[in-house]
Swiss-Prot record:
Region (Disordered): 1-80
Protein's name in the database: COUP transcription factor 1
Keyword list, A-Z: Activator, DNA-binding, Metal-binding, Nucleus, Receptor, Repressor, Transcription, Transcription regulation, Zinc, Zinc-finger
InterPro entries found in the cross-reference section: NHR-like_dom_sf, Nucl_hrmn_rcpt_lig-bd, Nuclear_hormone_rcpt_NR2, Nuclear_hrmn_rcpt, Znf_hrmn_rcpt, Znf_NHR/GATA
Length: 422
């Protein structure tokens, strides 16, 4: 799985015949046509090219080699006739889900994503994927589809235009696309596009005319925030590629922190009276000590939300913060904790580059955002359950519900979703 992370790039960085292993400036200057994973770069014999040192990677092929067979200048019609599938090397039928692939790999990827299929490799998760072996290991075939940049969200939401993030919202820099900025920008845009519905509208939709949220709306809003966290995680880069047991472990550990971040993002009203009422109506009358304890927990919750709101965190920053929280190697029983840690580092790097680009006059902003994360755990997950979810699901643990949502494939089909707060 580490191969998937180290090679992932923004789909916009790919061009016909791109090298899935990562762009090389010399190879880009030399190549004239497509090449799948593991292929040599090809160049037309006698065609003008950027001068290169003999032996330099990506140097033009000598006459008589395969490199001078049927190639034309980059971008010519002749060159495009030889575009190969970036997954298996077969003849490409066009660009599908962000990459040039054959019909077989296109159909396989579409079927795997739409049915949310989970495969198992019987070898070492590094099986060769080419025309002759592509059907032997579905796990490694899907891994390679994702490695070369095929986009899950393009399958789930139909045909999509090429990703062109709004410069004011997602773009990090307008510099050299090989310096990593395009990758970071694309990663953040995919995190944002994974949001199942606009979080920022929840609070205003549930508010009453007196600006106090009624008890009847509290559990509905809380359920939406929880469902939003799970659906978002299921659609962000890298998380769906993890083993289902790892997905469950990560969300069971971090759901309450994601809930607090979503509550802050949507400006969830946290008034003491209706929260106490929501916590007490389903149980026996609370003693004075218990009321004081609950008020303390509500105050801690309020403080965390207010501190985030005071930073005026934007949607891209919230997405990065949630990814940093989610990809934690602290979860128990992870199959590859080092891989999870590397995903957290990538999310942190994306946030750092974004903040430096968008808020150059706030040099301490990145540090302030990171410092907010450890304190999220001061909000007790059991108290969140008691305040917001017991009316909805009774004594069923949230961890059990999260597992059920992941195994069912969608929280929108989750049976509790139809329960109305009353």
């Amino acid at each position: 799985m580490a191969m998937v992370v180290s090679s992932w790039r923004d789909p916009q960085d790919d061009v016909a015949g791109g090298n899935p292993g990562g762009p090389n400036p010399a190879a880009q200057a030399a190549r004239g046509g497509g090449g799948g994973a593991g292929e040599q770069q090809q160049a037309g014999s006698g065609a003008p090219h950027t001068p290169q040192t003999p032996g330099q990677p990506g140097a033009p092929a000598t006459p008589g080699t395969q490199g001078d067979k049927g190639q034309g200048p980059p971008g010519s019609g002749q060159s495009q006739q030889h575009i190969e599938c970036v997954v298996c090397g077969d003849k490409s039928s066009g660009k599908h889900y962000g990459q040039f692939t054959c019909e077989g790999c296109k159909s396989f990827f579409k079927r795997s994503v739409r049915r949310n299929l989970t495969y198992t490799c019987r070898a070492n998760r590094n099986c060769p994927i080419d025309q002759h072996h592509r059907n032997q290991c579905q796990y490694c075939r899907l891994k390679k589809c994702l490695k070369v940049g095929m986009r899950r969200e393009a399958v789930q939401r139909g045909r999509m235009p090429p990703t062109q993030p709004n410069p004011g919202q997602y773009a990090l820099t307008n510099g050299d696309p090989l310096n990593g900025h395009c990758y970071l920008s694309g990663y953040i845009s995919l995190l944002l596009r994974a949001e199942p519905y606009p979080t920022s509208r929840y609070g205003s939709q549930c508010m009453q005319p007196n600006n106090i949220m009624g008890i009847e709306n509290i559990c509905e809003l809380a359920a939406r925030l929880l469902f939003s966290a799970v659906e978002w995680a299921r659609n962000i880069p890298f998380f769906p590629d993890l083993q289902i047991t790892d997905q469950v472990s990560l969300l069971r550990l971090t759901w309450s922190e994601l809930f607090v971040l979503n509550a802050a993002q949507c400006s969830m009203p946290l008034h003491v009276a209706p929260l106490l009422a929501a916590a007490g109506l389903h149980a026996s009358p609370m003693s004075a000590d218990r009321v004081v304890a609950f008020m303390d927990h509500i105050r801690i919750f309020q403080e965390q939300v207010e501190k985030l709101k005071a930073l005026h965190v934007d949607s891209a920053e919230y997405s990065c913060l949630k990814a940093i929280v989610l990809f934690t190697s602290d979860a128990c029983g992870l199959s590859d904790a080092a891989h999870i840690e590397s995903l957290q580092e990538k999310s942190q790097c994306a946030l750092e580059e974004y903040v430096r680009s968008q808020y150059p006059n706030q040099p301490s902003r990145f540090g302030k955002l990171l410092l907010r994360l450890p304190s999220l755990r001061t909000v007790s997950s059991s108290v969140i359950e008691q305040l917001f979810f017991v009316r909805l699901v009774g004594k069923t643990p949230i961890e059990t519900l999260i597992r059920d949502m992941l195994l069912s494939g969608s929280s929108f089909n989750w049976p509790y979703m139809s329960i109305q707060c009353s």
